C-alpha cells in the first residue's frame, strides 16, 4: 500500500506537478488562506451543526477509506447528522477525487441526480 496526502495510489504525474515551483507556491497559498481563515466556517463544527438545513436535499457522501485529509470519522459524523444521505466508502481510495474508485462513485451519483425531477 502506498498512501499519499492526496491519494491512495501513487501518482507520478501528481508528484511531478506538486514539485513544480509555480504550482507548489499557488497551492500552498490557497491552502494557507483556507486554514488561516478556519475553512471559512464560523465554528469547527458548523457543517455538523447545520446539517439539518440540507436534510431534505438528496445527497451522497463519498469517502475514501484511507483519506488522511478528511478521516473516515468525519464522513460518519456527517452521515449521522444527515442520515438521508447515501454514505459510500471506497475501500481502496484516499482523498483525491481523481482516484478511480472515488471518481466512479462521484460520476454515478451525478448520473443519479440527473434523473431527479
PLM regions and their residue ranges:
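Short, conserved loop/helix-junction motifs that constitute active-site signature segments
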Residues: 52-56, 81-82
